Curated annotation (Swiss-Prot):
GO terms for cellular component: extracellular region. Belongs to the aerolysin family. InterPro entries: Bi-component_toxin_staph (IPR003963), Leukocidin/Hemolysin_toxin (IPR016183), Leukocidin/porin_MspA_sf (IPR036435). The lineage of its organism: Bacteria, Bacillati, Bacillota, Bacilli, Bacillales. Residues 29-71 are annotated as: Disordered. This is Uncharacterized leukocidin-like protein 2. Keywords: Signal. One of its GO terms (biological process) is cytolysis in another organism. Residues 1-27 form the signal peptide. It comes from Staphylococcus aureus (strain bovine RF122 / ET3-1). Residues 30-60 have a biased composition (Basic and acidic residues). It comes from the Bacteria.
């Protein structure tokens, strides 16, 4: 009987120890969860604060202490959309107020979209009646209008770039010093940086044209285009060609490879990101800039049905452009649109 009593007492003690251990574990777990929750709330609040700061930074026109000591950045944005050409210009103007430099400084980032305007057309009056119009070239042009006191000192991108993705960073340091590098990142903790990043699959970016201190031009030109299992050069008249007996003049799309196979810049369009760095003599109060976005189109002409007639390629046959003039007030650090026009049948031609 005594042994049975001892067993019961031991069993009760074991249960008590287990319960106490479980309670301790639960308490520790609850405490840890509480700590984690507090930590999470702290992180969330910190992130929300950072988010608010970013939002406020975007909303505010002036952000102090971005350029060394007492430097300021004033940001402006202008957006112009033209329905006729289906082209959108979105320009960011960053005024850099640097007390250690004797000139005004401005970074202009040219963004927006140039829609592809891909079209399949029927032209019954021609033997090669089925047409495909596709964007073979995209152009962005920036120039200072009749003002020698404002100069272009640098640009991104430079030269020729053939990679599918283009990434570059421009950095400005106090005293008018600037630098640009490939990739995304800052070169100095005391500098103000601006990045560009865009996709150009199967196209090449070339900084060409009248590039000088008042004019810069970028061309994004089709190269070897891949669609499905095919790869053909932009100069090949068999590009996107499909010889099928079911193609008719009423269904021109059937004379060409399925459009969902086309590269993104052919199928959808191009989203530019180009940067210009300018300086201005402080005696000059206002400067006008003319910005032109252009879409060049090649036309591929196929004959429907069974035949032996070769397709026809006409390069840069069509084009649409949007030209906008912006005026910068250097003293008040403001920008406004003073003129805008667009037109068809105006492909960009160098020279």
């Amino acid at each position: 009987m005594k042994n049975k009593k001892r067993v019961l007492i031991a069993s009760s003690l074991s249960c008590a120890i287990l319960l106490l251990s479980a309670a301790t574990t639960q308490a520790n777990s609850a405490h840890k969860d509480s700590q984690d929750q507090n930590k999470k709330e702290h992180v969330d609040k910190s992130q929300q604060k950072d988010k608010r700061n970013v939002t406020n930074k975007d909303k505010n026109s002036t952000v102090p202490d971005d350029i060394g000591k007492n430097g300021k950045i004033t940001k402006r944005t202008e957006t112009v959309y033209d329905e006729k050409t289906n082209i959108l210009q979105n320009l960011q103007f960053d005024f850099i107020d640097d007390p250690t430099y004797d000139k005004n400084v401005l970074l202009v980032k040219k963004q927006g979209s140039i829609h592809s305007n891909l079209k399949f057309e029927s032209h019954k009056e021609e033997k090669n009646s089925n047409w495909l119009k596709y964007p073979s070239e995209y152009h962005v042009d920036f120039q200072v209008k009749r003002n020698r006191k404002t100069e272009i000192l640098d640009q991104l991108p430079k030269n020729k770039i053939s990679t599918a993705k283009v990434d570059s960073t421009f950095s400005y340091s106090s005293g008018g010093k600037f630098d640009s590098t490939k990739g995304i990142g800052r070169t100095s903790s005391n500098s103000y940086s601006k990045t560009i990043s865009y996709n150009q699959q199967k196209y090449d970016t070339i900084a060409i044209g009248k590039n000088n201190n008042w004019h810069v031009h970028w061309s994004v030109i089709a190269n070897d285009l891949k669609y499905g299992g095919e790869v053909k050069n932009r100069n090949d008249e068999l590009l996107f060609y499909r010889n099928t007996r079911i193609a008719t003049v009423e269904n021109p799309e059937l004379s060409f490879a399925s459009k969902y196979r086309y590269p993104a810049l052919v199928r959808s369009g191009f989203n530019p990101e180009f940067l210009t760095y300018l300086s201005n003599e402080k005696s000059n109060e206002k400067t006008q800039f003319e910005v032109t976005y252009t879409r060049n189109q090649d036309i591929l002409k196929n004959r429907p049905g069974i035949h032996y007639a070769p397709p026809i390629l006409e390069k840069n046959k069509d084009g649409q452009r949007l030209i906008v003039t912006y005026e910068v007030d250097w003293k008040n650090k403001t920008v406004k649109v003073v003129d805008k026009y667009s037109d068809d049948n105006k492909p960009y031609k160098e020279g």
